[in-house]
Amino acid sequence: MSEDYRTEQDSLGEMQVPADAYWGAQTQRAIENFPISGIAFGRRFVRALGVVKKAAAQANRDLGLVDDERADAIVAAADEVIAGEHDDQFPVDVFQTGSGTSSNMNANEVIANRAAELLGEEIGDRVVHPNDHVNYGQSSNDVIPTAMHVASLDALVNDVKPGLETLAAELDDKADAFDGVVKTGRTHLQDATPVRLGQEFGGYRTQVEKGIDRIEAVAPRLSELALGGTAVGTGLNTHPEFPETAAGYISEETGVTFREADNHFEAQAAHDAMNEAHGALRTVAGSLNKIANDLRLLASGPRNGLGEIEQPENQPGSSIMPGKINPVVAEAVNQVHKQVVGNDAAIAAGAAEGQIDLNLYKPVLAHNFLQSADMLANASAAFGEKFVAKLEANEAACEAQVERSMALATALNPTIGYDKASEVAKAALKEGKTVTEVVVEKGYLSEAEAADVLDPEGMTHRGILSGDDT
């Protein structure tokens, strides 16, 4: 940034602003007031601010509230913000005033000065005024929650859902590929009745698909926009047709359907929709964590673990142990889950706060939500493409472990009864024999009957196995 400065003014007086900056006095005050985290809003939220300001200018132009020349210049400047041409002009820390006023004014000042420049005027001369023109009929109290919903729903629809769909597709492929592989089921991390590896992967696929359903279910609440409520939800200083008109332009710009909030007081004083939607993200993160942990266990080894699946060699696993390969992508998914849980705690706390007519945790809600969405979108796609897609079944290990399993005795219950089946299982464990060997030795079943009743593949289907051929 240039060492030269220009003088900008707001209602509190003059401020020195870098000469090549599009922001003005209020943004500069925020920069100086909030040296908190060094974290500014990212691309998605800045884009959403541009979308809101563009739609507001279009609506105000249509309603005859801002003249065509200025409105068109604001629209052009906002288009540049939407395209990411001015991301470096949004330096305000996410930890700021709870209404997000600093970020709203940051957008107003950048767009006003760039619009003036497009009109052939000088930056800072206020021919396009940040409040009177760019922010006409708006308040930070309705702009920021509107941008929150626009950015959040955009993230869910265009990134999180496709990422999860990628993962679900890879899991579905493995469910088909592994459907003929019979393995030992496990409950309480102890041997249980047989299951097909494909059935387990089908369960994982369904978990992810239900996660997509949960995300889609919260979309209607996020599609409601606070814009038009102005300061406290009454709509003071805004045209009666402004909210609906602006929402139409936002829908057109994003390709996602948005509408005016059912109740502007609720839309500004509470952020239950953000809390609910992030709850869906937290649930999805938990599902991915469970799947990642299961796959890590199934791939444990390669010689002294379960070893039922073979993991991809994504990268060397150890700086000291040659040849070691770790489930690094699955571990990354585990860590994303922990961060999402932390973000959820912040969002739940922030959504429960705010006094009377305004929730004052808007920036931290937006930041944490969008971070979770970005991480889950990226983690889902990477998990599917770089880990799940490259998994292979270790059929020999699966078969060997099934043959040794004491849980096969469960299938004996309908034929010889629970007590005798327990006797067989205990004897097999004590004597180091298979269940089949013991049940035949004790004379409870013939070899042919045992082969029918103790068929591992048959146990993976609903029904009662019997040694009776009739």
Swiss-Prot record:
Binding-site residues, substrate = 99-101, 129-132, 139-141, 187, 319, 324-326
Any one GO MF annotation of this record: fumarate hydratase activity
This protein's pathway: Carbohydrate metabolism; tricarboxylic acid cycle; (S)-malate from fumarate: step 1/1
As given in the record, the signal peptide range reads none
**Residues carrying the site annotation Important for catalytic activity:** 331
Q: Which reactions is this enzyme annotated as catalysing?
A: (S)-malate = fumarate + H2O
Q: What class of enzyme is it?
A: lyase
Q: Which residues form the active site?
A: 188, 318
Instruction: Tell me the GO BP annotations in alphabetical order.
Output: fumarate metabolic process; tricarboxylic acid cycle
**InterPro entries associated with the record:** Fum_hydII (IPR005677), Fumarase/histidase_N (IPR024083), Fumarase_C_C (IPR018951), Fumarate_lyase_CS (IPR020557), Fumarate_lyase_fam (IPR000362), Fumarate_lyase_N (IPR022761), L-Aspartase-like (IPR008948)
Q: Which UniProt keywords apply?
A: Cytoplasm, Lyase, Tricarboxylic acid cycle
EC number(s)? 4.2.1.2
Q: Where in the cell is it found?
A: Cytoplasm
Top-rank taxon, per record: Archaea
The UniProt entry's GO CC annotations, sorted and at most eight, read: cytoplasm
* Ranges annotated as spanning the membrane: none
Q: What does this protein do?
A: Involved in the TCA cycle. Catalyzes the stereospecific interconversion of fumarate to L-malate.
The subunit structure is: Homotetramer.
Q: Which HAMAP family match?
A: FumaraseC
Q: What else is known?
A: There are 2 substrate-binding sites: the catalytic A site, and the non-catalytic B site that may play a role in the transfer of substrate or product between the active site and the solvent. Alternatively, the B site may bind allosteric effectors.
Family matches, as NCBIfam families: PRK12273.1
Family, according to the entry, reads as follows: Belongs to the class-II fumarase/aspartase family. Fumarase subfamily.
What's the protein called, per UniProt?
Answer: Fumarate hydratase class II
